[in-house]
Amino acid sequence: MALSIMSSYASFRPFKPSSSLSSSQNIIRNFDENSKYHIRSNGDLTPQKDLDKYRDVLRKADPFDEGLKMIDAIQRLGIDYIFEEEIDKIIQSQSAYKFFREFEHDHHHHQDLYDVALRFRLLRQHGLFVPADIFNKYKDNNKGCFDTRLREDIKGLLSLYEASHLCIEGENILDEAALFSAQHLEASMTRLHRYDQYQAKFVATTLQNPTHKSLSKFTAKDLFGVYPSENGYINLFQQLAKVEFNRVQSLHRMEIDKVTRWWRDIGLAKELTFARDQPVKWYIWSMACLTDPILSKQRVALTKSISFIYVIDDIFDMYSSLDELILFTQAVSSWEYSAIQKLPDSMKTCFRALDNMINESSHTIYQKRGWSPLHSLRKTWASLCEAFLVEAKWFASRHVPKAKEYLENGVVSSGVHVVLVHIFVLLDETSLTQKTLDFVENMPSIITSTASILRLWDDFGSAKDENQEGHDGSYVECYMKELGGSVEDAREEMMEKISDAWKCLNKECILRNPAFPPPFLKASLNLARLVPLMYNYDHNQRLPHLEEHIKSLL
């Protein structure tokens, strides 16, 4: 809902150059004059000395001002993996506690909302907890709500809106900030369209795709070229981002070729003609979750596991009798080849291919670590099949479970548990031990929250995959039967649950359990970020937004 703006046109302030923006322009000018950075014909980077010039700019930046704005620009452009060491040093130089105490005792004037909200967001993103109470300074004490004078500060409102998406449970002030900033940004659109089309587009894009819940992999390309952003450092780093985009694009094409050949060689597409045959779509999950180019082998391996989630889902959803599904689930629970003898050949082929994939992943870890995750991986797949079987039995008996029961099972049948356990193993970080793997295997909240987001988004439109026919349950159906509400009531409840799940996921990523290495946390977030794109069907049951992104990336 848009609010009317009471201030006059003259007093309405869009983005305007600040001292920090002027500073960024000076740095860009000096950098361009001294650098010969360019793209070679083969798309590779020029010598290391040119890349080092970017690193040098980061190292010399004031960590409390320029440094944070540079980090924001680098993250938006999707090249933060290049500067992990420099970014970590800037972030670690910050003190969340000191930041809060200094701000709390500043009684003389409001600090710039843009800077405060940016710092809040970046520190939280990197695991430094900053209390949301810092935003109390921007509230009208007499009215108990945000100061309406802030509605003229478009730059600050954008930063506040971005920061609000790192909310955790109980932070009502960030819920208020999200509503306040969104309302006034929406209200600004008409005026912005009159005299600043670029900024109007930027505001609209931010409202639709806040940074914390978006994938820079899909949005970075929109920043290429002359882009009058509130962050002038985007112009500084975009040349490097273009080079990286071309390099990584070639890498992704090579990985898709490997995945496609593997999929063809195992023969499941021929054996299971009823199942989905979409290796490129399955690869997108891996590409989104594991963004660092160095993780090429892991992306290919992860796509293999994801392909089986889709195929086995189709076996349970569309093809087999209930008796066959029970036998298949028993086979996956025991991992005894004798258990598949009474199954159709197609299901036998699927079981063997799944077992080979799991053994391959386990053997790689065994060679490196001297112990095997085989038991944990097998147990995870057994849990998935058991959840699929529960849904198959519900359908066969025409039983509609209560909404809570459906969602608890749906968290497992979403496949997120399988994906994240495989990611945890494939990353092979120093934190990977049998003890930490057991912890991840037992569905910690970082997994259940991510899985809830996927399950609810999947059910939101009750849409089928564009090439899928068959039967599935739906949270909407369960909610309406149990509580007698309308479709709109059910969907409103689902959106509230998605919001709650995001708050739980934020908490896990901000407070950081030592068992979870940063790449695993990032993969969990990225999985949740991709979900809306994967389930945003049009009236033709297609995914136009996802297809558009795939074309631009590949």
Curated annotation (Swiss-Prot):
A motif (DDXXD motif) lies at residues 313-317. Mg(2+) 1 binds at residues 313, 317. Highly expressed in glandular trichomes. Belongs to the terpene synthase family. Tpsb subfamily. Mg(2+) 3 binds at residues 458, 462, 466. The keyword Metal-binding applies. This is (E)-nerolidol synthase TPS18VF. Pfam families: Terpene_synth, Terpene_synth_C. It comes from Cannabis sativa. Binds 3 Mg(2+) or Mn(2+) ions per subunit.
